[in-house]
Structures are given as C-alpha cells and as structure tokens.
C-alpha cells in the first residue's frame, strides 16, 4: 500500500500520498485580521493620540494632552447586535489632561469618544446587524524610488521620487540636456542645486565639497545656476526660487520661504514617512547595500587602531563586506559633518557618511558614495541628509552605479491591514477635531474650561462610521460557505482609497511577479476587470511590523550544507540575496541533499545549482498557493486558468443539507474549516458532560463548566442556512482548540463543499452538449444536492401625515382564505407554508381625502359617501419567495428596541426554502469544470455499471482535452479506488499521488488499471460501444441557482422618461428587444410583429390603454400611436435649438398630442357632471354603469401617464 495514514482532527483519518515531511504547521489563517486589530488596540490608538496631541492654543496658554484610554463593556453582545441591527461596539473613554501654563493648574478628565466597533473572534465586525470584513489593502510603500526611461534617441534618463506616507512628494529628474532638476509636489521644475543651496550650502564650492566635481550632470547644472540678484545671498535667492515654484504669484520673502519648506518637509504633523518609510530610505541609502560589488578608491582603516580593513583597489564582495559592516554602523566611521549657513531652512549640522569608489565605466575617475549618516529610525520626516544622499544615488545612477527599482516588487508594496486602515481613519477624525479644540481654547475662559468642553467628538465618530459603513475596503462578508468566508478575510486588494483604480491599472500591476512566490497566490484572483488587483494571501504568508509580506524558509547550514528545521521568515527584499531550493528537492534522513545539484530560485531566475550555494529551502510545496487553491487535488495537472475558476467556484458552493468531505482531499480541509470561524471550537480541555442540538457543556479539568451555544438555522449573509451540528458525544474527552460542532459545509471537522457522486465521462443523447450535465433523479429524490435558503422580509408601521399605519388582520378587499394564517395583529404564524403573493404582515395605511382614485370619485359621485379611508400596504411574498415561515421577530419601542424615527413597530419574517437540484442549476468540480443541469433522468434510464449501480452524473468528455484540466480525471480514478476501499485520501498540491500510485490504488480496490468500465444503457440494457471512464469526484452545487434567475413579466413598471418597461428581475422588468433582434424580424419581413413590439408592448402610452380596452371588449386592435421615446427625441432636439416638426401628408405641422386624442373617452369631470345631471342613470342596469366606469378608468390611466 502506497501512502501513509494521517489523522486530521479527531474524527477523520486519510491516506496521505505526500512524500515531503511537513516541518511547519499552517499558521492561524485569520491572524492577518485578529493580530492587526489587536495591535491597533494595544499600540495604534496610543500612537495616533501621540501624533495629534498635545494640542496647544494659539497663545501657548493651554495644552491638552493624552493620558490613557479604556474600552468599556459593549452594550450588546454579538447575537444581540445581529438581532437588533445594531453595531457590536464598546464605548471608548479617553483620559485627557488640560494644563494651564499661566496658573500651573492641571485638570484631568475622562472624555467619551463614541462607540468603537469591536472585532469578533472570527475576525469580522458587526455593523448595523450585518457581518462585515475589512479587506487588507496592497499599496505602494513610502520610501525613495529610482526609475529609468529611455528618451527618443535611446539614451537613458533617470528619475527619483521620495514618497511619504502623507505629505509632499520630492522628485529629481534629468532633462534632455542632462541638467538635473527637482520638483516639489508635482509643481514646476527647479534646478537641483537650488534645493541644495536652500538647505544652507550656498556657494558652488560648498556643493562641490559635498558631491565632488566628478559628475557631469552636477557640473552642467551648476553652470546653468547663476546668481541673479546680488542683493540676496545665494541661500536666500534659492529659498525665494523654491517659494515661487510652490506659491506662484505671491510676494516672496526669505522668511516665508523658510517657513513653507519647513511645513512641507520637516514638520511631523504635515509630513510623515511612517516607520516603514524611514526603514526603506535608510535601507536604500545605506552604504552597506551600495558598496557591494564596487571597487574602493581609498584605503579604509579602523578609526581606533588605524588597522587597515580594506586596501584601495579592493573589490567589495560579501567577505569584505562582512568585515566592513560593523564599522559602517559606527557613527565615527568615514563621516563628515557640514554646517549650513545661518539663513538656511534648518540650522542643524548635517552628517554624511562618504566613501570614495572607482567609476565602473572609467577606473581613472573617482566617485563618491554618500550615505545618509545614522538617522534614528523613529525620525518620521525627511532630513537634509536624506535629500543629499538621495541626490548622490541619483547622480551615481548616471555613472552606472546603483539599481533602479521595480515598483511591482513586493519589497516596494506593502499591506495596510485593519489596524492601520482604522488608525488612518481615526486620525482623520482627530485632525478635524483638533481644529475645533484650538478654536474653543481661544474662545473659552482658560480658568474655567475643562477637557470635556473643548472636545467635540462628532468628527471622530463620523470618520469611524463612514469607514465601516461606506469605505470601499469595508465589505459585506461573503458567507456562502466557510471557505468563502475565510478567503474574504485573507483577501488583498490594490483598490480603495490611496490605492489604484480599475481603469488606471495597467497589465504590469496585475501580472504575477516572481516575489509573489510564497506571499501572494498566483492563481486565485477574480476573472474580469479586477483580475490581478484583488489577490489572496498565500498559505504560509504573514505580515511583518512594516506591512511587508514574509514567507518562511528552512535554513540550510552553511558549513554542513544540511537542511535544518530552523525557520526564517523573509521579506521579498531579503529573499533577493539568497538562493532558495524547492521543497521537493530529495533529502536524506539526516537533512542532507540526495543530489549534488538541485533546482533553486535566485531572484527571478530558476537555476540548477550546486548544493554548497544553497541558503534556504521552501518549507512546503503548498506555500506558493492560497488556502482555496491548496484545496484542489492534482492542481499540478490543471491548466492555471481552469485552476483559477476552480478556486473561485469553491467559494460559491452552497451548503448542502447533508454534505460529505471529499474522498480525495488535499489535507488542508481540516485546517480551513477549523480556522474559518464557522465551527464550534473548544476553549479548553475537558470532558463533555452534555450534548444536544442546541448546546454542548464541557467540564474543564479545573472543574469549571464551559457552555457552548450552537447556532441553529440562522440566516447567513448570503441568505444561506447557517446551522451547527455537534460531533462529540457525552463522556468524550476533548482537547483545547478541538472541533466540537460542525458548521455549514462541514463534515467531521473537515470542509465539505459538495458530495462524492459516481460520475462517468460519456455523452448521452446530446444532453451534455456544451458542458451541460445529466443528473440521476436519485440525487433529487434523496436530497443529495438539496440546500436550505432563508430570506428575511421587513414591514414597518410608521407615523404618516394622515395618521399612524396599523398592523391588523382587517385588510380591505381581502378574503378569509388569505387571512387564515394571520393572527389578530395580522402577523403570519411560524410554520405556515406561503406562496407568491400571500400576506405575511397585514398592514393598512390611512388614506387622505385628497388622493381619491377615479373609481372612488365615481362611487363618491354615485353614492355620495366616503369608502373606508385606508389603503392595503401589507407585506406580501415576492415572486419566487415562497416557502415555510421559519421565524418572526417583532420590534417595538415598548420592548426596548431602537427603531428609526417615526417607526412604531417593525416585523421581520424569515422564510425558509428547501431547494432541490433542478434543471438550470449550476454545478462544478474543483478543477474549473463547471456546467448547468440540462436534464434529470429517471434512475432506471441512467447508464449503469456491470454490477447494476446507476451512474449519478454524466459529464461530457469534450470538456477535458481543450481545457487541459486533467486533475479531474486523476481525481475520478483515485476517488473510485477510495470509494471501493472505504477510505479517504489526501493528495496535497505539488506533492500528490503519482500515476503509479493511482494505478496501485485501483489494483488494490480490484478495479481496472485504466479506471474504465463497461457501461450499459439503462433504457435498452445494451452495453455502450466503448468502455467509459467512471469514478468518484467531489462535485458541488453553486450559488447560481435557476430559482433566483428565472423571471417573467406580465404587467409591470415603466421608465418615467421613455415610458419603456424597466429591465431586470429586481425591477420586474421586460426582456430587451435590441438592435439585432429588430434586424432578425426585419429579415423575416415580420412587419406587424415588429410594429407591435416597438409600440404597444413598449412605449406607445395611449396605444397600450386602447389595446387593453379592445381585448376586453373583443374589438379589433386599433392602429398604434406615437412611441413616447420618439417624443423624447423630438424634445431633446428642440432643446438643442433645432427646429424639429412632425408634418402630415399635406405638409402641415401636426401636434404630437393630437395623434393620441380620442373623443370617445370621457374625461372624469364630464362623467361626474353626467351622473349629477342624470340621477336616473343610477337606476339603469349594472352593465351600463360598468361600461361608463371602464371608460373613466382607461381615461384616467391615460391622463396619469401623459403627465409623466
């Protein structure tokens, strides 16, 4: 027997075909959410208040400081928040201290800062009763970036951008003549030397002293930069030039220029690199990285002992760098301090680290490498040393030293997770509040004011509310199944505020990059406009403190060349320096490599390399892909486009009534279900004392009792059924973190998205043409693919101008048969079976005398009394919404429920539908092999196996070769063997069962080695010509169900302007008869059919009414009138000032209105006069009154539509 047994949880054992030992467990899969939010609570809030406060008033008398914060107990727990459509949030109280510097008085006070949403253990937020997820954002990291473009002559031109987290951008570039320019915040160009002068290095000799005179671009720029105004010093002149670029047209003085530059770059409140920006700049400008592979043009010695570290002319390789490295970290090694002139922007001295090197293009030429000194990593603004070192890197690029940056490299893109996104939003609110506080400080009496009086929390509350309610990154959670839910929490989006937009994103940003390896899944991404912009975090990926994605590698011992079990997490930048072997490189038991050379990755190259050069090794073959993709067995045999569809469609699988975990899994099913948040997980070890369908009680080892309440038949976000079932029994011992109860789409603790039917690849009467699926009726009868769907419907009783609405059983014009399931208040009973149009909540609305309809006016004219003045506004079951009433909730202010203003009562009705699989439903396997059910065949007519077993599903064999998803065929064969052997198997991605192992399993199960079987026709009993591939495959029913899509319109709403029927099921719209359909009817010469489609059935308003009348009276259909859209066209052209007229045969203008007139239709007023003047009309036969009435009705309809 190939393979070995592996236990997944307590309840499932699989035969695993993995040959690679797992050295690292898959991490907690929703940690990306929970850890980030925890950071926000522990550090983010303090950091943010630290940035904004202390707030001083304009005179410097008062100062408001942050002391501490505290989150109180939430008002509602998670379930109550769901039930009341409320937020799961806690009151945030902040302790503030107000100091009066004149009197020395200090006041401390707790200030309420609004309700702050809390994250649930599952990594979600509950906002207005609905679960939401904050998607992590993939953005460009702050830092300094160098790029290269070629001009039209093919000469390289370099550019540099310093990007802060917030604040002004600083850019350097060379023009066509090779002169170096600077732009501040995308304004007009300025010579680079002018910015250096503004920093306090005014003379040409100062500039050459810093940079040396060996750079052509610098020398040409100095030539162009002449002293224009002798009355100003060079520094002041440069400052004014900078000011003129930033504020053109305003009067410029040296002082205002200084203040402006300080505000733009050196004021921490307006310019922020964030810790990640400082880290990136220090890394990019550090001499450690820049000296590597350069030749020294001076001898470097130990400053203390004078001992030579490296001679002049030495090439600095890794060995030399390891000796140099400790010295480069010292603040006294090769550093020079420059003091700016007194009229500079900043007066502090600038320390630079400088080392001379040979030019690679001309060894006679000596160039300088200038580092930015040792700037503290807590310094969040850009410093003059950064600007000068950045200019030096820029000048060196033109001499062939240094590298340009790839902006799609994951070393230059970082993740903003929940905590940081929240912090940024909160900061916006606090900044708005800061202005208010300052104003109030200057208005109120400094001696009596308290922190509470200064603070206005409204901007803070509004910013947080807006973020959770309407930000692009705060999304309604996909809760179709556990995989979809977990995937949503691990999603990485490049869209959203501060990110890209769909239209601007090019192909490069969307493409797979070599740094995605082990960090971002190259497969799972949506098809369509968002392709490549929305990604998924790889299985082992994690996010470091700077927001870069790290992936784990096993360290290889440099001396013994053995693979150790020590794990290092590397960012994309760090990985570029190492050679990494693949996880499937064969190893001996002691960790040494079997072969002398192995396949490895170095940068973007895949190379075969000797083992003594290997630094690291992958931890697992599945570290490349995300959890969704890792759940596809034989992924390595599928084309990537189909694998993408497979990974995406697994998220759309509907939770079934009785799901089964796949017979052929990959081993990730247990971990995926466990971490998704839908399973009930034990908090501590103990013994199960009690189990039923609603709760599990576990007695801990310390005697404490834990009670776990299970979710029963709750409606999930997607309208699916959310139900938990216990899988432990009384007396069982459970460990901490063990699965106690399965959630939806789970079985025995594992993910179970579908079923394991018997599938054959064969055609059947053409019914599986074009990916259609032939189903066995047994799957319908035995509820194999049956799912439960729960929909909620609300009805509110409001106060209207004419009086309150009322929930009641007394509904006008309604028969007793429609009221049979309503109680005295008009509310449906739980358990009632309802169909389209049935009343769920009886409700009447008072009706004003003003809005009498035509019939009532007629009745009023005839009988002279008012009908009961209420209108039926009951909540009815919409089309396709029938089912069984599962629950009814009544909300009233008397019960302490918070309702919207003007609402006296709200009733919410939940209707459950049991949907069996039917023709038109979409189904799919895990390999992107999707199709729709085309026919359900009686069990006795289905093809059957030699032992009489009917096939469950027939798939078209044509769906395999061109799509190249061969994984499904391998799964089919291995699944059949597993079914026969009564086992579950695990075939992990890139390390699964080989062809030989599948053949061995088939042999072991006593099946033919090619996995094919003779199949007999169920209708004739004759064998089919050829043997057919038969086996077991995991097959799912997807959320695209025909019940949600089928739609037909009888009488429905019309668009206001064009009077044409609306479109779409939601609007109860019509079918669009488009341009090409018109051509088709024209081609057939079906003129009259076409005419009525374009008039009566569309927007001939008067014609519609007349046709209706004609049909009722049995008269011939009149000629059509003018379509409303033609009138709209005429009016539009007239609005453009064109004299457009409609002429008759004689050439006279015709009013469009005249074409609709019909004198036979009486206006209402005329009818009322008629009735009043002829009282004996009321004694006539009913038929005559009815005839008059129908005329009134039709006329009234015409009038209403004409007004529109």
Curated annotation (Swiss-Prot):
E.C. number: 2.7.7.6
InterPro entries in UniProt: DNA-dir_RNA_pol_bsu_ext_1_sf, DNA-dir_RNA_pol_bsu_external_1, DNA-dir_RNA_pol_su2, DNA-dir_RNAP_su2_dom, DNA-dir_RNAP_su2_hyb_sf, RNA_pol_bsu_bac, RNA_pol_bsu_CS, RNA_pol_bsu_protrusion
Pfam families: RNA_pol_Rpb2_1, RNA_pol_Rpb2_2, RNA_pol_Rpb2_3, RNA_pol_Rpb2_45, RNA_pol_Rpb2_6, RNA_pol_Rpb2_7
Catalytic activity: RNA(n) + a ribonucleoside 5'-triphosphate = RNA(n+1) + diphosphate
Highest rank taxon of the organism: Bacteria
Family: Belongs to the RNA polymerase beta chain family.
Subunit structure: The RNAP catalytic core consists of 2 alpha, 1 beta, 1 beta' and 1 omega subunit. When a sigma factor is associated with the core the holoenzyme is formed, which can initiate transcription.
Protein name, per record: DNA-directed RNA polymerase subunit beta
Organismal lineage: Bacteria, Bacillati, Bacillota, Bacilli, Lactobacillales
């Amino acid at each position: 027997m190939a393979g070995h047994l592996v236990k997944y949880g307590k309840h499932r054992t699989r035969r695993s075909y993995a040959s690679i030992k797992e050295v690292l467990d898959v991490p907690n899969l929703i940690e990306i959410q929970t850890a980030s939010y925890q950071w926000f609570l522990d550090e983010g809030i303090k950091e943010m208040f630290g940035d904004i406060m202390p707030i001083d008033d304009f005179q410097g008398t008062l100062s408001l400081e942050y002391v501490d914060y505290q989150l109180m107990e939430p008002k509602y727990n998670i379930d109550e928040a769901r039930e009341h459509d409320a937020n799961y949030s806690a009151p945030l109280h902040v302790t503030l201290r107000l100091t009066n510097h004149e009197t020395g008085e200090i006041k401390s006070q707790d200030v309420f800062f609004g309700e702050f949403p809390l994250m649930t253990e599952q990594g979600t937020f509950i906002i207005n009763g609905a679960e939401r997820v904050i998607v992590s954002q993939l953005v460009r990291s702050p830092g300094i970036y160098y790029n290269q473009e070629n001009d039209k002559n093919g000469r390289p031109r370099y550019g540099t951008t310093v990007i802060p987290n917030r604040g002004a951008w600083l850019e350097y570039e060379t023009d066509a003549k090779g002169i170096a320019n600077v732009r501040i915040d995308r304004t007009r160009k300025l010579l680079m030397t002018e910015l250096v002068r503004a920093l306090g290095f005014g003379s040409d000799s100062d500039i050459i002293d810093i940079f040396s005179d060996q750079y052509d671009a610098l020398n040409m720029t100095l030539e162009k930069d002449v002293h224009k105004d002798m009355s100003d010093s060079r520094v002041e002149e440069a400052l004014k030039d900078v000011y003129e670029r930033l504020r053109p047209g305003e009067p410029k003085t040296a002082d205002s220029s200084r203040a402006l530059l300080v505000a733009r770059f050196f004021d921490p409140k307006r310019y922020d690199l964030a810790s990640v920006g400082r880290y990136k700049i220090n890394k990019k400008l550090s001499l450690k990285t820049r000296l590597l592979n350069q030749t020294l043009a001076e001898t470097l010695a130990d400053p203390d002992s004078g001992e030579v570290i490296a001679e002049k002319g030495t090439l600095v390789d890794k060995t030399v760098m390891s000796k140099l490295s400790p010295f480069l970290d010292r603040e006294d090694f090769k550093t020079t301090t420059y003091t700016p002139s007194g009229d500079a922007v900043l007066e502090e001295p600038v320390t630079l680290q400088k080392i001379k090197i040979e030019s690679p293009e001309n060894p006679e030429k000596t160039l300088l490498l200038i580092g930015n000194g040792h700037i503290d990593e807590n310094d969040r603004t850009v410093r003059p040393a950064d600007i000068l070192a950045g200019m030096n890197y820029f000048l060196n690029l033109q001499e062939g030293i240094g590298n340009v940056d790839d902006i799609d490299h994951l070393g230059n893109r970082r993740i903003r997770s929940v905590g940081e996104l929240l912090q940024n939003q909160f900061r916006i609110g606090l900044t708005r509040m800061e202005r208010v506080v300052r104003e109030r400080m200057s208005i109120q009496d400094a001696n009596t004011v308290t922190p509470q009086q200064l603070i206005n929390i409204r901007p803070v509350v509004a910013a947080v509310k807006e973020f959770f309610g309407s930000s692009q990154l705060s999304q309604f959670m996909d809760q179709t199944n556990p995989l979809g839910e977990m995937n949503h929490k691990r999603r990485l989006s490049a869209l959203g505020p501060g990110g890209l937009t769909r239209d601007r994103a090019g192909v490069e940003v969307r493409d797979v990059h070599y740094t995605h390896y082990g960090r971002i899944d190259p497969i799972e991404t949506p098809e369509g406009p968002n392709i490549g912009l929305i990604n998924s975090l790889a299985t082992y990926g994690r996010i470091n403190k700077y927001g870069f994605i790290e992936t784990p590698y096993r360290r290889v011992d440099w001396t013994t060349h053995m693979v150790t079990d020590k794990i290092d997490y590397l960012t994309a930048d760090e990985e570029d320096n190492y050679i990494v072997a693949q996880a499937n490189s064969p190893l001996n038991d002691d960790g040494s490599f079997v072969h002398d050379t192995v396949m490895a990755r170095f940068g973007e190259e895949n190379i075969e390399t000797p083992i003594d050069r290997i630094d690291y090794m992958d931890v697992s073959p599945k570290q490349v892909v995300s959890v969704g993709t890792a759940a596809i067995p034989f992924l390595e045999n599928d084309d990537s486009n189909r694998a993408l569809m497979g990974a995406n469609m697994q998220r759309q699988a509907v939770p079934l009534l009785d799901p089964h975990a796949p017979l052929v899994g990959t081993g990730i099913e247990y971990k995926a279900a466990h971490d998704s948040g839908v399973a009930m997980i034990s908090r501590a070890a103990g013994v199960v004392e009690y189990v039923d369908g609603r709760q599990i009680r576990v007695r801990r080892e310390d005697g404490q009792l834990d009670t776990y309440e299970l979710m029963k038949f709750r409606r999930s976000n997607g309208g699916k059924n959310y139900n938990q079932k216990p899988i432990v029994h009384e007396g069982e011992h459970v460990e901490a973190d063990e699965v106690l109860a399965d959630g939806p789409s789970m079985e025995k603790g594992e993910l179970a998205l579908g079923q394991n039917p018997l599938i054959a690849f064969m055609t059947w009467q053409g019914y599986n043409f074009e990916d259609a699926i032939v189903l066995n009726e047994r799957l319908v009868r035995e509820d194999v693919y049956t799912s439960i769907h729960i929909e909620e419907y609300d009805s509110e009783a409001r106060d209207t101008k004419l009086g309150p609405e009322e929930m009641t059983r007394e509904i006008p014009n309604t028969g007793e048969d429609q009221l049979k399931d309503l109680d005295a208040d008009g509310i449906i009973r739980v358990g009632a079976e309802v169909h389209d149009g049935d009343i769920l909540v009886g409700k009447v609305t008072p009706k004003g005398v003003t809005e009498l309809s035509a019939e009532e006016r007629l009745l009023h004219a005839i009988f002279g009394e008012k009908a009961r003045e209420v209108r039926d506004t009951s909540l009815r079951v919409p089309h396709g919404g029938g089912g069984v009433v599962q629950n009814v909730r009544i909300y009233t202010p008397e019960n302490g429920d918070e309702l919207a203003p003007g609402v006296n009562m709200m009733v919410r009705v939940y209707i459950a539908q049991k949907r069996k699989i039917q023709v038109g439903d979409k189904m799919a396997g895990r390999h992107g092999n999707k199709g729709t059910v085309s026919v359900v065949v009686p069990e006795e007519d289905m093809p059957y196996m030699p032992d009489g077993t009917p096939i469950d599903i027939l798939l078209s064999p044509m769906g395999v070769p061109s799509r190249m998803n061969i994984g499904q065929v391998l799964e089919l064969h291995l699944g059949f063997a597993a079914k026969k052997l009564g086992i579950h198997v695990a075939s992990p991605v890139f390390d699964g069962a080989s062809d030989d192992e599948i053949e061995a399993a088939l042999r072991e199960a006593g099946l033919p080695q090619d996995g094919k079987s003779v199949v007999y026709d169920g209708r004739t009993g004759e064998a089919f010509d050829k043997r057919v591939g038969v086996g077991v495959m995991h097959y799912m029913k997807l959320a695209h169900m025909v019940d949600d899509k089928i739609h037909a319109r009888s009488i429905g709403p019309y668009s206001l302007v064009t009077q044409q029927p609306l479109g779409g099921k939601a609007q109860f719209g019509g079918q669009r008869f488009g341009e090409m359909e018109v051509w088709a009817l024209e081609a057939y010469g079906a003129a009259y059919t076409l005419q009525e489609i374009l008039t009566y059935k569309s927007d001939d308003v008067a014609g519609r009414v007349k046709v209706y009348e004609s049909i009722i009276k049995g008269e011939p259909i009149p000629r059509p009138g003018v379509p409303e859209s033609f009138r709209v066209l005429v009016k539009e052209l007239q609005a453009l000032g064109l004299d457009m007229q409609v002429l008759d045969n004689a050439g006279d203008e015709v009013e469009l209105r005249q074409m609709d007139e019909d004198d036979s239709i009486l206006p209402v007023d005329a009818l009322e006069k008629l009735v009043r003047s002829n009282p004996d009309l009321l004694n006539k036969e009913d038929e005559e009154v009815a005839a008059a009435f129908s005329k009134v009705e039709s006329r009234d309809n015409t009038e209403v539509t004409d007004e529109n």
